[in-house]
Regions:
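Acidic, PIN/NYN-like endoribonuclease modules and their adjacent C-terminal/linker elements
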Residues: 1, 102, 106-130
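Short, well-structured N-terminal submotif of metal-dependent ribonuclease cores
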Residues: 1-34, 45-60
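Acidic active-site catalytic centers that drive phospho-/nucleotidyl reactions
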Residues: 6-8, 40, 98, 116
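Short, hinge-like loop/turn segments at secondary-structure boundaries
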Residues: 47-52, 87-88, 129-130
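Active-site neighborhoods of divalent-metal-dependent phosphate/nucleic-acid chemistry enzymes
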Residues: 68-113
Length: 130
């Protein structure tokens, strides 16, 4: 299964959360992380006291788990528009960065691994809530 990690799931994995580690080991034949999630993580690292440590750990995790990074491109931007319009028609709002994360997930045809239940409102992707 292709698993796309949401920002909160990466954070929990980095802290050794058993449910995340188990889900990734069991379901994650192929692992992806959206560049948008990397942006959120870098923002948090820059605000914190252990920026270099956290950045190094992120690079190590990406390399060790052979994660592919999903970049935002024209195809992802189109999917973003589709998802945004679909949610707007339902009267549903989710955070803008999460729209981009959903679009990245849609781009690779993966299942989003997250703790955020609002992703279940996105009909275009499969979601696994932890």
């Amino acid at each position: 299964m292709k698993l796309v990690l949401d920002t909160n799931v990466y954070c929990d994995y980095a802290e050794g959360a058993p449910d995340v580690v188990e889900a990734m080991a069991h379901y994650g034949e192929f692992l992806f992380i959206p560049s948008v999630a990397l942006g959120e993580l870098n923002y948090a690292f820059m605000k914190g006291r252990r920026q270099q440590f956290n950045e190094r750990k992120l690079r190590q995790v990406i390399n060790r788990l052979k994660m592919d990074i999903i970049d935002v491109n024209a195809d992802v931007a189109r999917k973003y528009g589709m998802i945004f319009l679909s949610l707007e028609r339902k009267g549903t709002k989710i955070p803008i960065n999460d729209l981009w994360i959903a679009a990245c997930c849609m781009e690779v045809g993966g299942t989003l691994l997250t703790r955020d239940k609002h992703f279940t409102q996105v009909d275009q992707i499969d979601v696994m809530i932890l």
